[in-house]
Amino acid sequence: CLYNDAVWVTNVQEAVQEVVSKHSAMMNPRIGLIGHQKDQSSYYLRLFPQWESVDVENHHALSATPLREGYLLGQMPAQDVLPQGTVNLLQNFQSQEVYHSLREEARFIQQYKQAWDVAPYTPTFVTVDAVVVQSGHILLVERKARPGKGLFALPGGFVDQGETLINACIRELREETRLKVPEPVLHGSLKGQRVFDDPYRSARGRTITHAFMFDLKPDTSLPKVKGGDDAKSAFWLPLSALQPERLFEDHFHIIRAMTGMY
């Protein structure tokens, strides 16, 4: 549960307790959390003080990130670092259409980052996202181009020079959805704002997004919308129909955090 460690920790505790209760008759069984403290991303290993923590050294400098990035760019990992069964699975997956789509996405990300190699500093991007809800529905768009081509996303984008965050959010909302709700009504429906800044939330690089929550007045019909600009289409989706694998980057978690679904 990105952006809500308490929920994630609770889920892990409950899952471990369920397994322990089935396989151990001891009142106080010993539970060990075994992992490698690689960097800041390993902070979760410190979230369970009730269990014994066992730190292990890195094994032969293996890391999943370069293996995964290389594979998505068409390179098979060396067979001496993976079990043969895993190698077979990865080779078979390369023949599927979904792999080719992932490879094109990885190439786009690689080229995107290379375009910033000449910058004197590693860039930090600032974006905005509109979380618009009405009558149990969320307003989404289908992305027209990479990254995330074909995925559902919140209306949003980069902040232009000389505009405030809220103005950027409303501009992107109108450009991508053609939402006809008057601007004064949008301002009156603004229920919250939150920064989402997980360092790894975007494959493009360090991207900090400011999400604005608009809770429109309930009605028997939803406002008409139409995809525009970077959006192939715009539509209303019941909140109960959200599927994390269909949403771009961390937008599923942003929606859950902003709407109180956690």
State each model region's role.
Residues 110-154, 181:
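N-terminal strand-loop-strand
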